[in-house]
Every structure is written in C-alpha cells, then in structure tokens.
Amino acid sequence: MGHTDVVPVNRDGWSVDPFAGERRDGFVWGRGAIDMLNQTAAMAAVFKRFASGEHRYPGDLVFLAVADEEAGGKLGARWLVEDHWAWVSTDYLLTEIGTPALAGRRGMGIPVTVAEKGPQWRRLHTRGAPGHGSQPYATSNALVPMAAAVAALGANPPGAHITEEWRRFVEGWDPPGDLAADLLDPDRIDAAIDRLAFDDIGLARWVHACTHMTVSPNTLHGGVKVNVVADRADAEIDVRSLPGQDETDVRDHFRKAIGPAFDEIEYEVVEATKANGSAPAGPLWEALTSAISEVAPGRHLIPAMIPVGTDARFFRRRGTVAYGVGLFEDRVGFGDFLRMFHGHDERVSEVSLSMTADLFLRTVERLGEQV
C-alpha cells in the first residue's frame, strides 16, 4: 500500500520545479519523491510483474494506492478498512516508511517500521469581543490568551520517556561508544540528543521524537483586520504520543504547560489515535530477512518505531501485520534523508528505486514460500 497525495510546497526553497519530476544527477527530484511516491512506484512495478504472470504468488496480492494519507486517511485507507474490508482484507501489509541504513557496531542495519507514534491533533480556540484597534484599553482580544497558551506549550515540552519499542531499536542499531547507554537513560538522553545535533540534526530530531511526546503548534489564525480587535483565535497543534500514552496524557500535559488559563480555552480533539505496531516476528519478518540477505548481503534488520503516522494503523486494528521498509544506496545518509520529508529539494536516487523494487519482489516471493 502506498499513497499518492503529497503535502504543499514553498517553491522559494526549491532549486527545481517541485512538481516536474526532474531527473538530475541520478536522482528524481520533486515533492513526494520519498514520501512516498518512491515506494508507491516500486510497488506498482512489482505488482505489474505478478499481475502479468511473470511472477506468481500462491494467494491474493492486493495493491492499494490511496490519495489522502496526508489528510488523515479518512476517505482512503480508513474508508476501505471500515466500509469495504472484504476488498482489502489482508494478513500482511508492506507500506511506508523506508529509510537508508544506519551504521552501528554490528554493521549496517536496515530500519523496518514495525510501530508508529499516535497522531493526537488538537485545536485550541479563544473568544473575545470586536472593537476598534485604536482603542485597545479594557478590550477582550482573543489573540492575547492564545499567544500566551501557544508560547507556554513551546516553553514547556514533555520530558523523555523510554519505551520498549525504543529499547528494541537501540539494541538493533547498536551505535558506537557510550551512545547506546545514553540513549536508553531518560536522565542523559536529552544531552545526547544535543550532541547528535552538532553533526546530524536529522538524526537528532528523529531520536528526540521517538523518545518524547511531541507538541508542535503549527498554525495560528486570529482576527480579521489590523484595526479590528480580534474576537476569535484558533491554533492547531500536532501532538504525537508514545506507546502507553493516550488522550488523558495529552490533556494533562496541556493543562500543566498552560496553567490555570487552560480552563478558559476551548480544547478540541481532532484526532486521537494511540501508538500502534506489529511484532517483528513471523512469516513476513522472516521473508524480509531472507530478502535482505539476497539483495543486501551483510545487512541486518532493525525494528523501528517512527514518529509519524501512516495508513498502516487502520489495518493493524484488524490484526494485519504491517511493516514499512525500503532499500537505499548510501549517497544520502539517514539524517539527511529524514530532513527531506516535507522539506525542500526532496529527491530519491534512481538506483534506490530499483533496489526498493527488488526488495519488494524478493519479499513477496519469500513470503509466498511460507504461506
């Protein structure tokens, strides 16, 4: 399963037309190149080979290309799972995300998405009364309490929390020196993240997001005109919860961060999905392990939790084992790759497209030998 929709762009930050699909220096450039048109294209190419009879699978093989993952999946994967399960019912699922390899003391490891944090999107609303902007004395300006609330959320981030999913990832990665121990200690991990940021800000952001509930105020709207006192303000906050956390934990954090003013703000739950995952064991995991040994000898799998949400969560609710994986050459490192997600100059190498398609093909073939 892949998605075909992409997020908007700011063209000023791009060195190419973000929607031209330009091929340059061995890369395909454009919005969605790694999120996730690369994997979707590889899946389509592999599915064609099975559909044409060139390769065979002893069961049903379904290819899904959905168009609203970036908007929450309500009209795509969620609709298919909830309203048309008979069409898409599956025991195993391959989807996003795939990343380049990570170097550790065990060698190069391929992160495989086996779990993901929970999207817990929130909206805050404040109300005031309109008036002339030239006479603000004793007015009720909705922007003022909203600005204070957003600032409080930014100034009071949640602390580190080490989950079993994170321990499993660090053990599989096995980074050099004392880094592994630092990354598993809630009292030392923030300092370790700061050190990582000097050399690799993309990796540092990943580590931080995988070990903290994250709270990111990303939109703020209020008022209608510069000379009118704002009678309404609205903010949207992207919250991502860790395994074991739920709606109550999110609300408790907002209340603690904002303080008594929280009770004067309208708090809206937009999305409330818990973290979810699949065990890194069983036929699909074994098929992936075999496929990697064939197409990337000497590399091993690292079960990873990702800080983003994917459409896999809808299938996992039905008991489907869902993983995200890809295979990439080493021209772009793990951290630099992550920085391109929803960023400028997104691109994927043509060699990586071929490698990912080969991995998918071998994985399906090896799974077919087991089921």
Regions found by a protein language model. Give the residues of each.
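Acidic/His- and Gly-rich active-site-bordering loop/insert found
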Residues: 1-31, 40, 52-59
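Active-site-adjacent substrate-binding region
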Residues: 150-158, 178-184, 279-329
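Serine-dependent amide/ester hydrolase catalytic core
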Residues: 233-247, 251, 255, 262-307, ...
